[in-house]
Every structure is written in structure tokens, then in C-alpha cells.
């Protein structure tokens, strides 16, 4: 009889091992066997929980996305209710510690690349993109006309992605302070009359 709660503990252990494997060996070097080795369990157990490598990557990305959505929700709730503060909170969530560790950043890069070839990952990417745009648009719409709010949301989303991507590819720890400053300056520019 399986231990109560063991399924979630084991899944978390395997997702952590997947993040470490992608960090150390990249997506091509990440296999069910490499994940099993890092988690000190059999390959059969990895297969039991996730089926195959695609299932493992999907579960890992769902975990990373949940962390992002949790950080976004937490920061928006904690922020003052004005659009500028809430927009800054959304930006900060994208540069949250849960999103900028080397294993997570490399997993994001692998996910983006693989999402162009895998329908389930593509769907996850579209959900994430729409959620970010919707959150940004909702806040900009409190201060700007609808069309401008949509354009501002698209611009800020592109800036977030660009700053994040440059940081991820820089080869060292991401300079979140510099990224946040640039994004805040952009928000301030758009809301200058606010």
C-alpha cells in the first residue's frame, strides 16, 4: 500500500531533479535515466509518474508556471491599488527568485524552444502569454483608453520577455534591479499623464 502523500512528494522530487538535469545537461541531455539518477530512484518510477520525457517536461513547466502565477497573484494583492503599483508588481513577479535561478531559466529556454514542436507545450505557452497580456491590459486600462492599454500591454510584455531573455543568456546571474528599473521607466513613461 502506498504511503499517503508520497505521490506529491515523489513528483516534486522528480521535478526538482529535472530542473537540475536541464541546468547541467540541457534538454537534449535530460533523459528519464538522468532524472532518475539525480533523484536516486529507478527509471521505472520516473516513467510511472510522467510516462515519458515530454510528460516530465510538461509537468516541470506546469510547476514553474504555477510558481510564476503564485508570485504574480501574491505581488498584485500586496501592491497598492493604483495601476502603476500593480503593473510594477506584475513585472516583479516575472523576475521573482522562483523565475531567475539558473535551473529555472534554462528550463524556460528549453520550454520555449520545445513549445514550437509540441502541441501541449505550445498550449501552455499560449496560456502564459495570454495571462500576462490580460493582467497588464487590465491594469493599463484603468489609466489609458482601451486601444492604448492593449498596445501598452503588448509593449510591456515584450519588454519583460526581452529583458528576461537577455538576462538568461548573459551567462551569469540576472541583474533583476536593472531589468526592473527599465521596465518601471517604461511604465512611468506610458503613465506620465496619470
UniProtKB/Swiss-Prot annotation:
Pathway: Amine and polyamine biosynthesis; betaine biosynthesis via choline pathway [regulation]. PROSITE patterns: HTH_TETR_1, HTH_TETR_2. GO terms for molecular function: DNA-binding transcription factor activity; transcription cis-regulatory region binding. SUPFAM superfamilies: Homeodomain-like, Tetracyclin repressor-like, C-terminal domain. The keyword Transcription applies. Residues 8-68 form the HTH tetR-type domain. Residues 31-50 bind DNA. HAMAP family: HTH_type_BetI. This is HTH-type transcriptional regulator BetI. It comes from Burkholderia lata (strain ATCC 17760 / DSM 23089 / LMG 22485 / NCIMB 9086 / R18194 / 383).
